[in-house]
Amino acid sequence: DWDGMIPGLQAGKFDVLMDAISITPEREKILLFSRPYAATPATFAVTDTKILPKAAPGAPIVKLSGDANADKSTVDALRKQLKGKTIGIQSGTVYTKFINDSFKDIASIRVYKTSPERDLDLVAGRIEASFDDVTYYAANNTKKDTASIVLAGPKLGGPIWGPGEGHAFRKQDADLKTKFDTAIGAAHADGTVKKLADKWFQTDVTP
């Protein structure tokens, strides 16, 4: 629950947030982040591949800069396919601005408190596409109630999402952050992050 995580951290209910949290300037104002452990691409998902074609296994990540002109060709192709559709996104994520800026004028955007709630609406046909981490879908779409959901369209990564995902700490917990930084650096250096990502997500998420 995004609404409760940061207040819970600040209140001392837990000492670190570990939930694929994208590092952003806004979040860095109130949180202390570890070095990025991953830079995860995002993608659309559908149950009807007539809306968007099923993602090709092993397809390269399309890099988005966050500049509307530079990203225009990729976004325009998606706009054409998603025109008139309803897209579901989870509230409070780094993807909200991209979806609103790129598609709000040609599609309906429905915001959900949680990703599982959104996924069930996608399966039920109440929305026609969703947008989230590639790793989220890889981990969740093996479940029986969401087995009909498939990744669709290109994997989108690059500077648009910021430096990547990190673990979040209270501002005063610099010593704990340093310990995590050391462990993350070792996992990158020996290839552990890439090995695990390739095994479980079929995508290299090394920052």
Regions found by a protein language model. Name each.
Residues 1-76, 148-159:
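Acidic, polar ligand-binding/catalytic clefts
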Residues 1-7, 72-75, 109-124:
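Short helix-initiation/N-cap motifs at beta->coil->alpha
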Residues 2-3, 14, 21-23, 36-38, ...:
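Solvent-exposed coil/turn segments that connect beta secondary-structure elements
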Residues 4, 20-29, 97-103, 116, ...:
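A ligand-binding cleft/hinge motif common to bilobed small-molecule-binding domains
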Residues 29, 40-42, 83, 127, ...:
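Envelope-exposed proteins and targeting segments
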Residues 39-43, 135, 142-182, 203-207:
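Periplasmic-binding protein-like
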Residues 44-106, 110-113, 134-135:
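Bilobed "Venus flytrap"/periplasmic-binding protein-like clamshell domains
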Residues 47-69, 73, 160-203:
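Extended ligand-binding regions for polar small-molecule ligands
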